[in-house]
Amino acid sequence: MISKIAWELGKGTISSNKKVLAMTFSVNAAMKIKDSLKELLPELVENSEQYISKVDVANYHNFAMKLLFKHGYALNTEFINLSDFIIVDESNRVLNNYITSFDSDKLNALDDALRASDEEEMRNVIDDYWNVLNTKLIPNHVITYNGLLVSAIKLLRKRQVSSFYKEYYRMVIIDEFQDTNILGYWLVNKLIGDNTVIFLGDDIQKIYGFLGAINGIFEKYKEKYPIKEIKFCNNYRFRANECLKALDKLIRSYGNTYAPSEYEASVNLKHLANDTEEDNFIVDGIDKIINSSNDKVAVLVRAGNQGEPIADKLSRKGIQYFNALFRDTDIEFLKFYEVAIDEFHNAAGSSGKAVQKDLLNCLEAVRQRQNEIYSSARRKFVYDAMYKLLEVLFEESKKWEGTSKDRYENIDFILGSKGLKHMMEYIEEKVVLTTIHASKGLEWEYVIIPRMNAYAFPTGYMCRTCREVHSCNDGFDYCKFLFGTLMEKTFKEEISVFYVAITRAKKNVFLTVNTGLNQWNHTKQTSCLIELPGLSHNDYDWEIVI
C-alpha cells in the first residue's frame, strides 16, 4: 500500500490540486501509513513534504467525519457544531436521554442488519435510522458510529458532493478490504468514478464476519466493474522459513477450496496428558524463550477463558506478561472506556485540544476511579491492561502530526470506538496473552496456540453443528473433518481464524493439545484442524526448538 502510493506520487500522476485517499481500519494504522510515506518518499522524489500533503489517510469513520465537517450543514445545520458532538454506539445509555424505546428499536434494527450483512434489510431500515438521527440525536449533538457513516452516505447521494470527491481523489486505496461491512461498501461505491480505486485484502483473513464483514466482497466488485485482479504470490514474511511458508500455503488452500488439499506441510504439535501438563509445558516454553533471547512470544487462544490457567501459572512463576484475555463485552472493559472518556473530556475541558498536561491529568483521574471499574481483585487485570494501553496511546500520540486539536480528535475517536487494543504492539512486555481476534495485525517472534481440541478450536458451535449434519469422523480422542456440504461457511470461518493465528509468528509457531478428561469426565478429542489432510505433526521439546 505504501509503495503504491509513493510510486504514484513519485511518477506525478496526481496533479497539484488533487489528492490520494488512503483508508484503513484504525487510527493507529493511519498514522503508520503517514510515517512510512515520510520515510519512503525522500528516496523517490525531491521536496517530499509537498507530496505527503497530497495524501489523506483515514479510516471509514474518520473520513465520514471529515465530510460532515465540510458539508454536513447541507443535511442538518447542527453539523456545523460537529466538534461538540458525543459519538456513541447503539447500546450506550446516553441515548436514553433523547430517544424512546421505539426509536431505539429502529437504531438496533440497522445494527442487527449490518452485523448480519443483510443488504436488503439495511435498505429497508436505513431511512428510519436516519430520521431518528436527524430529529432526535443530531439536534442534541449526539450521533452514533453507524450514524456517521449513514450521514456521510446520505451526503454523498447529493450529486454535487459525490462528483467533487470522485474528481478530487484521483486514487482511492483501501487496506484490509475483506473486513468491510455494508455501510463501508456503500460509502466506497459513492467515491468510484473515472478515478483509480484499489482494494487490498485477503479473503482468508476475514475473521470479523460476526461484525458484518461482507462475504465475497471482491467478487461483488468483479461483477459490477471491469476489475483488474493482481495476486501477490510471494510471501515475504516467510521467505527464509520454508516450514512456515509450506504451512501458510496448506492452510490457505483450505480457505480457497473446500476439499482435501493437494499440498503438504508440518506443524509443531505437542500432545500432552491433561490440562495441567499442557499449561506447565507452555509456561516452561515461555520461560526458555524470554531467558534465552530478546524475542517476544504470544499465547493466542480462541476464547479468553482458555488462557486463564496459563496466566495463573505465569503469575505464580513470577513471569511478567501482558494479559489481554478480556472480552469486548466484559463489564470492566466497558466501564473503563466510560471512565476514560469522561476523564479525558474533563481534562481537556471545552478547549477541544489535548496537551500533555491534560493527558497526565486524565491518567491520574482514571487511576483514582479504578475501584469503579472492577469489583473483585481477580478482575483487576482488565483495568491494569486497559490503563497500560491508555498510557501507551497518550505516549504514542506525541509522535502524531497535526495540532493539539487533531490530537484530541484522534484520541477521542480511539476511546469512543473502543480501539485501545490496537496499541498492543507498543507494549514493552515480552509475553502477551490474548485472543486470536485481538491479535490481528500484530506479530511476535514466537506464537503458542494451546487447546487444539474439538469444542475449543473449532468452537463448540461448529463442532455441534458438524456432528448434527454428519460432517466428521468422530473418534474416541480425535475428530476428522469430512467436508459435508452444509458446513462450508462455518468451516472456512474457523480456517480463517486458524490462518490468522499461525501467521502472527515471525520465527515459529507451536501448537499444544491434550486428551485428558473434560469437565464431564469424558476424554477430550483433538481438533479437526490439526487432523486436516496434508498436515503432519512434529513432536517437539523446548530444549531443541528454542
Regions found by a protein language model. Give the residues of each.
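Accessory N-terminal region flanking or inserted into the helicase ATPase core
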Residues: 1, 19-21, 88-171, 182-184, ...
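Helicase P-loop NTPase motor core
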Residues: 226-228, 233-319
